[in-house]
Amino acid sequence: MSPERARPFFDLMCEYPELISNNRLGGGVLGDTGTPEQRIATDALGRQFEVCMTINRSWGYNATDLRWKSSQELIRNLSDITSKGGNYLLNVGPDAEGIIPEPEVERLKAMGRWL
């Protein structure tokens, strides 16, 4: 986002200092939190961060994407991210009927058992 487009948001952040912003605004605004995607960033250490990852390789539902991350990889990510003080935003994609695909359910249940 250009600095001009980011300015109204920046002004709101100044007017409401309790407002939380992330690093995606652009325009030179760093935000309160880092939000790396599909990677666990070591450069986020020392500030609040939330790692955004998918359970396979696609954001949302994609019937052709069957490249599921293993339960072990997802648990490792969860452990790694939270041990560094971060949040783990794991994207799962229900289909058009609102049904979570069984491979996702299996992995989420494995994570729940681990917790």
Model feature map: region roles:
Residues 1-115:
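Mature catalytic domains of secreted/periplasmic carbohydrate-active enzymes
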